[in-house]
A protein has these predicted regions:
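Polybasic, positively charged surfaces/segments
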Residues: 1-371
Length: 371
């Protein structure tokens, strides 16, 4: 919930920047096949989720309202035991689902066995082509997952965990994934991989700000395209560049008071500190909002109360934020919990405090503009 992956696109360049094609086109229906073996389950053909922001996992769109990602045991434990104080700040969890790969005449499709009771409450439409075609972004991305994450070996089904799609029905979803992690968490037994992970923290804004941008996509009015920044870009920029990128994302087009966003971050931080069930070695904050088209170009950073040429706010319902990616969240009851150093138990505090302080600075700047 950190790079961005969009359907039917070229792979990002070395600078981490991708221009996204013009938005438009009809949705494709998710095909439902009769299930003769399990009366209570439906067989749904899945698509690669076009608007994945952040992470390296294979995220699939099950229906218009549901997405899923490969199941990590630590994340499954967290979602099944979310402390009440954190529930308003995490995506709606829909349980586990079995995903398998079918190949017919050289063409692959991914299928999920989903409870019919869940499907009845969901719209069975998804964006994009569900067949993993040659040259299609879905094929490139999913083949990477199959090779590097060892998914669907020997055509065996894989366990995924399923969530509500936070941007269902969005027209132009803008999203930002911020990874909170000041120090490398140490949860890797492979020495070479451990070194790479340590360098990611030491050589990025994780070490200076306590967070780094893992991915962002934002709508450009001038070009009518999405502008995308992936995790490699986020690891290559300095503190000043991060702040400028945040200023763009949380500018007036987000449709929400920056103070409100900052206060929500503070509330999330307090909720994490006050819960006693889990230790957060690393986690991500996902910010998202929808953009409406306007007739005229508007500045990116002006007082939030300003309206567009039609007297309307250009964003729908404002910017929202959720905690995501709980693979590095450890139950306090874990038998090795006592081995975790105190500075790692407080690993997200520095970053989330800095982030809210930066947004408070934006709010003060807005106040000066108004005056």
């Amino acid at each position: 919930m950190t790079c961005v992956y969009l359907g039917n696109q070229h792979q990002p360049g070395s600078n981490g920047l991708v221009n996204i094609e013009e938005i438009g086109g009809d949705n494709s229906k998710v095909q439902m096949e009769p299930d003769s073996t399990e009366d209570h389950e439906g067989d749904v053909i899945c698509c690669a989720f076009r608007h994945q922001v952040g992470g390296h996992k294979c995220v699939l769109q099950v229906t218009e309202n549901l997405i899923c990602k490969p199941c990590e045991e630590s994340e499954r434990i967290f979602y099944n035991n979310v402390p009440a104080i954190l529930q308003p700040y995490v995506p709606g969890y829909r349980g586990e689902v079995s995903v398998y790969c079918k190949e017919n005449g050289g063409h692959k499709t991914l299928h999920a066995k989903v409870s019919k009771s869940i499907l009845r409450s969901c719209r069975t439409y998804a964006d994009g082509n569900c067949e993993i075609e040659e040259g299609n972004w879905g094929k490139t991305r999913l083949n990477y997952c199959i090779k590097n994450e060892s998914l669907w070996k020997n055509n065996s089904p894989e366990k995924f965990i399923m969530f509500d799609n936070l941007i269902a029905n969005f027209e132009r979803p803008c999203a930002l994934d911020i990874k909170l992690c000041r120090y490398y968490h140490g949860m890797c037994s492979d020495p070479s991989k451990k070194l790479v992970l340590e360098q990611k923290c030491n050589n990025s804004t994780s070490s200076t700000l306590g967070f780094r941008i893992g991915g962002m996509q934002i709508y450009q009015h001038e070009t009518r395209k999405m502008l995308q920044f992936n995790k490699h870009y986020g690891m290559s920029i300095n503190d000043h560049q991060v702040i400028e990128l945040l200023k763009i994302f949380f500018g007036r087009r987000s449709g929400t008071s920056i103070r409100d966003i900052s206060n929500t971050i503070k509330n999330i931080h307090n909720a994490v500190l006050n819960q006693k069930d889990f230790i957060f070695l690393s986690v991500s904050l996902l910010f998202f909002y929808d953009i409406q088209e306007t007739q005229h170009s508007v500045p990116l950073f002006q007082p939030e109360a300003d309206l567009d040429a039609k007297g309307q706010n250009p964003a729908k319902a404002g910017c929202k934020v959720r905690l995501i990616d709980f693979e590095k969240v450890i139950p306090v009851s874990d038998e090795e919990e006592h081995l975790i150093p105190q500075h790692l138990k407080e690993n997200i505090n520095f970053g989330i405090t800095n982030l809210s302080n930066i947004l408070d600075g934006f709010a003060i700047e807005n106040d000066l503009i108004k005056d």
